[in-house]
């Protein structure tokens, strides 16, 4: 099964690119983040015309997440369970595969900046609380004894090799020690971080480049989009 995640930064602006990519790549399940639209404004018909089932958790102007799947999406959950949140950052559903049920997600984890000098700014506290709630929910999912994938834009740079310049990110919410520790606690529940486990880290796995800073031509990227997997069966590659 081919899982994919994409922070589209406005589905309205990126729709032609999304449609072209879906036709070319043919992913089985896709998580989209930063839709920046309410559910009623999501271009459902255009995506369904390509053979995808669609579930959204939208929000006007900001945030918003969606799941697209070639298989029916069942048992849909909107919002991170156990966490009161006015922002639309989490959606979850179950797809039935020939190997059993797979619970899939689309996550748009808070950025967390500014952090404050002491790491106590409300935006950073919100990020850490959100990650703690995700850890708790992952523990719950593990109790179901079914495969699942936590996928999306985590706004976490896991390690020095996941950014073009570690020193440039020191003190940033994406790279603070507290962020690393929270991310590691989630993985240490027994999950597999797909890219890291494939031994293909480095600048060929960056997922974000700041267009305002001209980062793309210089390959000044970072890896902040992740798939954390709980698999009940093995595949030749965690990327498959």
Regions picked out by a protein language model, each given a short descriptive name:
Residues 233-240:
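Conserved small/polar residues in nucleotide/adenosyl-binding loops
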Residues 2-11, 21, 25, 39-54:
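Internal alpha/beta domain cores that form substrate/cofactor-binding pockets in large enzymes
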Residues 61-76, 203, 214-232:
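Conserved beta strand-loop-helix elements of the APE1-like EEP
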């Amino acid at each position: 099964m081919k899982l994919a995640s994409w922070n589209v930064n406005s589905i309205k602006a990126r729709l032609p690119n999304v449609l072209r990519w879906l036709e070319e790549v043919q992913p089985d399940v896709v998580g989209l983040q930063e839709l920046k639209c309410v559910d009623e404004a999501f271009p459902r018909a255009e995506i369904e015309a390509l053979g995808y089932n669609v579930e959204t958790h939208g929000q006007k102007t900001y945030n918003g997440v969606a799941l697209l799947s070639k298989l029916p999406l069942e048992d849909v959950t909107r919002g991170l369970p156990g966490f009161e949140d006015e922002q639309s950052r989490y959606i979850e559903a179950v797809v039935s595969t020939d190997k059993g049920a797979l619970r899939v997600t689309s996550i748009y984890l808070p950025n967390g900046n500014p952090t404050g000098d002491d790491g106590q700014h409300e935006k950073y506290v919100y990020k850490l609380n959100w990650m703690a709630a995700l850890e708790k929910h992952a523990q719950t999912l593990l109790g179901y004894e079914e495969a699942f994938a936590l996928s999306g834009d985590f706004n976490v740079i896991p390690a020095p090799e996941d950014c073009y310049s570690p020193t440039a990110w020191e003190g940033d919410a994406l790279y603070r020690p507290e962020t690393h520790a929270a991310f590691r606690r989630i993985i240490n529940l027994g999950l597999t971080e797909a890219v890291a486990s494939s031994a293909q880290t480095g600048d060929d796995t960056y997922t974000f480049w700041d267009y305002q800073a001209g980062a793309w031509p210089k390959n000044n990227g970072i890896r902040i989009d992740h798939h954390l997997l709980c698999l009940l069966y093995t595949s030749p590659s965690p990327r498959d």
